Amino acid sequence: MLKRRSNALITLSRTKLFPITTVAYYHRRLLNQQRRAVSTSPKKEIKSLEDLANLDSLDGVDTELIRDLINEHTTKLNIKKELDMLKKFSQEEESGHEIPVKRFIRPLWMFILMGSSVYLLLHFSWWKLEHEERESQLKKEVEILEHQLNELIVQDKTHNTSRGKGSNESTHMKPWYRRWFW
């Protein structure tokens, strides 16, 4: 049996129905009545979640409408997030092709330092070998010159002894400035 009260239909069961069935029936009937009341009432049309936020209460609003508005807004947000993600991926892909210079600065400095160290080491060893070679050449030249000097000294001694005293007097007769140069 159905009884009408202010805005709802109440089912009264004289038969032995389960309480769950009775509540479900009552709930379904109440929802149908609310839908009819919303569609017949001259209220503002609700087109977005902002319109729902401006309402005082959600009593007269269809739950399907609320669900659809929430789903629509969620879909918009998801699409916006996906577009942002795609833009980010495209920017990363473009920047991935460009190799940043920062990536090569440290290895470049390491290469320069190691290269200059190797260069200085090799240059020092080359300079040392060249110096030793030049030193040995100069020693040979000194030995040759010493040998020539010794020979000249010996020749001069033999030559001086052969001249005797006459050559000494002639050297004294030369002017003083000639004795210094010859």
Swiss-Prot record:
The chain crosses the membrane at residues 108-127. Keywords: Chaperone, Coiled coil, Membrane, Mitochondrion, Mitochondrion inner membrane, Transit peptide, Transmembrane, Transmembrane helix. Residues 128-182 are mitochondrial intermembrane. Residues 128-158 form a coiled coil. It is found in: Mitochondrion inner membrane. Residues 1-45 form a transit peptide. Component of the INA complex (INAC) that promotes the biogenesis of mitochondrial F(1)F(0)-ATP synthase. INAC facilitates the assembly of the peripheral stalk and promotes the assembly of the catalytic F(1)-domain with the membrane-embedded F(0)-domain. This is Inner membrane assembly complex subunit 17.
